[in-house]
């Protein structure tokens, strides 16, 4: 399994150190990958220093992206070519304790949610099969010219399992 997230340069500066520390502490055996929009040389070097694979996906965006384009950021480069399941997180959603992650999925996307004020919060993380990740990437590419108003359309793209977990912040 691969742990994956995506970030623009601002979110990278705010959250990368925490994401890197927690993912290496909780899941040291998992390969880590990050998609970056407009990264600095220093940010690329941080990835190298922490043995985190990265892709610069700036070229996939229009010259002057809007806020709505960034709703697609984490969906445009799910690394399905590794042919491993992908634990996709937001860079600001951190694992706080180990969870028994499924090795074999019987659904396309296994969503991880947490309680928030008595209700289930948004999707904190999800596990994708390589096949479902490819579907999501291809769909996100079709939306870049007309980006969504939120990331909700992408969260609803696949059949998902109800799996609330109180293991992510």
Set out the residue ranges of the language-model regions.
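Conserved catalytic core of nucleotide-sugar-dependent glycosyltransferases
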Residues: 101-157
């Amino acid at each position: 399994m691969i742990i994956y997230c995506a970030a623009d340069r601002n979110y990278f500066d705010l959250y990368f150190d925490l994401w890197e520390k927690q993912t290496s502490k909780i899941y040291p055996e998992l390969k880590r990958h990050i998609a970056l929009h407009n990264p600095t040389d220093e940010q690329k070097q941080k990835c190298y220093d922490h043995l985190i694979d990265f892709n610069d996906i700036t070229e996939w965006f229009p010259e002057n992206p809007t806020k709505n384009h960034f709703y697609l950021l984490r969906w445009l480069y799910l690394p399905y070519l590794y042919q491993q399941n992908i634990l996709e997180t937001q860079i600001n959603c951190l694992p706080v304790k180990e969870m028994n992650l499924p090795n074999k999925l019987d659904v396309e996307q296994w969503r991880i949610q947490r309680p928030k004020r008595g209700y289930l919060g948004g999707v904190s993380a999800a596990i994708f099969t390589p096949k479902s990740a490819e579907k999501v990437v291809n769909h996100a590419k079709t939306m870049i010219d007309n980006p969504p108003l939120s990331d909700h359309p992408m969260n609803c793209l696949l059949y998902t399992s109800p799996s609330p977990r109180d293991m992510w912040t």
